[in-house]
Amino acid sequence: MAYLKNNFNGNVANPKTLVKIVNKKSKIVINYKAYNSCLFSYSSKNNSELWRGCVCEFFLDLGDDFYYEFEVAPNGATFVAKIKNRVVTFFEQDFFSGSARIEKDNYFVEMVIDLDKIGYNPKYIKYNCFRVEYKPNEKEQNLSALNPTLCGTFHVRDKFLTL
């Protein structure tokens, strides 16, 4: 388990987010504990702009010319897309499940990715974990990352970690 850091400077993030990643038998299981959230979910519709609210995100690079982006909002809405040259392509899939549970001002997310259904090279799996905390009345999003990109976007592939 590890705490996410402030995405801009790498310091301790506030609010705190604890993440645990387990790679077992071709499934990646990611659990987030997102503390002290305003719990603002931008939409209840899957594959909408969930990042405009509070959300936990997981980026997965399997060595292709694209990478996957997975998101789960506090209300359980999910986002699954391929990102290639900063272009988002949504698609129907059966290899991802995401869920969220709220307790007071915290929410807990579980993501499960079945790598066998995607097709992958077990020697090349890269990833990064993120959280967006966004209060609708504030202009700035609070961005945190397992491996901070040190800028205003999470889409920095060379900051992905090896699993």
Question: How should each PLM-predicted stretch be described?
Answer:
Residues 1-163:
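Structural preference for beta-rich elements and adjacent junctions enriched in aromatics
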